Amino acid sequence: MIGGIDMKRVEDIVKIVSPTKVEGPVTAVVSHITADSRTVQEGSLFICLVGATVDAHTFVDKAVEDGAVAIIASKPIAVPDHVAVLYVEDTRQALQDAVPFFYDYPASKMRMIGVTGTNGKTTTTHIIAHLLRSQGYTVGVIGTVHILIDDQSYPIHNTTPDVADLQQILQQMVDAGVTHCIMEVSSHALALGRTAGVEYDTAVFTNLTQDHLDFHKTFDNYLAAKAKLFKQVSASYQVKEGKGAVINVDDAYGQAIVEVTTAPMITYSTEGKGTMNASNLSVTAKSSELTLNYGEASYTIQTKIAGLFNVYNTLAAVGACVYEGLTMDDIVKGLRTFTAVPGRFELIEEGQDFAVVVDYAHTPDGLENILQTAKKIVENRILVVFGCGGDRDATKRPIMGRIAAQYGDRVFVTSDNPRTEDPVQIVKDVEVGVKEGLRDGVDYDVIVDRREAIFAAIAEAKAGDVVIIAGKGHEDYQILKEETIHFDDREVAREALKER
């Protein structure tokens, strides 16, 4: 055993990846597996991936120097005699096959719940985790905010980690006694095969709106990536019971997901279209109440989270927990004690007579959702501070500008994470849409410095206003061209409130 997993030798990996050629000894023990040359250690199996800009075959010498006992490659390489080389046609496929095997397929030892969609994944996963935890289960969460193993939180860099990292995390969860793992499953992860070796028991679809077209190129590709999760659950349902899908049929693309799903499903709606429906909605700045109709019964649901979008997130979580065996009475009781996820419609309170909300909304639909919620609860004006990220789908910039101007009474266009792009050009792209959407009496400012923009909006706010600071939510950094700096919208908002 190595760290809770069965010992593997190079010859065991050979059986899994079926190489076209093997050179060198195959009896060495593999104690670690990676596709990142920076993490190679004594006993590692190093897999040479060929990316868009980097070819890992160029790092073989360093990997051997750092202790690699075997290399998986698709191109001829020269290594010392004591290092094994497994030649394959597709190293990425080899990675997807070898890593889950190395970790003894940890996902098969837990209930796996996958949540996919453009918006709502984080809140939905956290509601599911809260409800399961309230019934005594030991829970793991993998998502945008963090990795959570029982009550321990760890930082994360991708919504869904790469194959090697994901399998290692899942093994840590198994070692910690986790019974249920709830994952945000991004379209990137599904398209790139990052979830290889993971068989989901419950799949949840929240919604599909414009995002990530810089990666997927077309909306059809984006939809197809999301649909993979439901095809997989449907296929595995043929051989294993206890599978289910939970699908938002109010979303324009929900029906497309329904059509590819042959596993049992719960469809949810606020318009009476689903097998689980919400009615009698009442939303305030800090809470929501609704009637949930499922089967022959109706239940009064009370939560401490606001917004129609959170009603949908709640329905998604309820559906998932039904498949996980929770009773409706337990679900209703558990929902009363759930509080907002960091950076998701998070109220910043410093005793002021107006509301300040920090939210992760970084898509057109996400921004419109929070502004619609603000419209329902505001007594006076809506002030919007937002920007768009660099090196990402540029077509959504004017769309988001138009939405901000249509709903906001005062708009502050600023930077988000400009990355390698010129922040001035990004705000100009956004400004095009702002000008198109401006209503009579609405004004806007362009303040490239995000800190200054937040301070300006809060300084201008009056009693009864709502200040929406959108785009970064829980993030505590800002990615600039030359560096990544510490930056937290919530901290800056508190500073601005204290200086008023």
Positions of predicted regions on the chain:
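Well-ordered beta-strand positions
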Residues: 45, 70, 202, 244, ...
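Structural beta-sheet core signal
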Residues: 141, 183, 203, 247, ...
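N-terminal leader/targeting and accessory segments in enzymes
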Residues: 2-97, 252, 274-277, 302, ...
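Short glycine-rich anion-binding loops that position phosphate/pyrophosphate groups of nucleotides
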Residues: 51-53, 77, 187-188, 210-211, ...
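ATP-dependent carboxylate-amine ligase
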Residues: 1-19, 45, 319-329, 333-336, ...
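Short internal beta-strands
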Residues: 69-75, 245-249, 385-386, 410-416
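Phosphate-binding loop of NTP-binding sites
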Residues: 14, 95-245, 253-261, 377-378
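Acidic, Mg2+-coordinating active-site environments of NTP-dependent enzymes
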Residues: 78-82, 202-355, 433-440, 445
